């Protein structure tokens, strides 16, 4: 089912603050709390809302470095791709991994306590022949100017 104006407003509000009360949501979309809760549950059931998470203050956790790694695989065989992607999924330091177009196959965002840990991590990946990594190009984050807080939503059709 295509989201209507009220659904899009709910999605926008919940992307900004997943702890917004049903009462506050209801007031914002001018529906009863029961009707609003039903809409939220429907959006969850339809997969438009996939979960709720806390936004953690990275600086409060202590010093960390964030690295963006462009990774090229030696080949595109399904077994190689599956092993590589499973490794990225298992690595706690990998906070995001995107398959991309261009000269590299993946863009990986990695968060480590220091460069030594990043080096240890990537050396381990390169030494694991089964992962099929040909090349890693590293870009260190100097400053986060805008962090991801939610997807842009389409305009309502009515």
Language-model features and meaning:
Residues 1-158:
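A compositional/biophysical signature of low hydrophobicity enriched in polar/charged and small residues
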């Amino acid at each position: 089912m295509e989201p209507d104006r009220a659904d899009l407003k709910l999605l926008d509000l919940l992307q900004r603050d997943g702890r917004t009360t049903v009462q506050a949501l209801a007031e914002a979309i001018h529906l009863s709390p029961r009707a609003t809760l039903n809409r939220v549950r429907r959006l969850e059931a339809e997969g438009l809302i996939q979960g709720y998470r806390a936004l953690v203050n990275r600086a409060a956790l202590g010093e960390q470095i964030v690295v963006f790694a462009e990774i090229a695989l030696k080949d595109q065989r399904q077994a190689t791709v599956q092993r590589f992607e499973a490794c990225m999924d298992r690595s706690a330091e990998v906070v995001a991994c995107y398959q991309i177009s261009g000269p590299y196959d993946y863009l990986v965002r990695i968060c480590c306590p220091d460069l030594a840990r990043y080096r240890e991590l990537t050396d381990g990946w390169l030494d694991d022949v089964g992962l099929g990594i040909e090349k890693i190009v590293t870009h260190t984050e100097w400053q986060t100017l805008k962090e991801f807080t939610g997807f842009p939503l389409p305009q309502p059709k009515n």
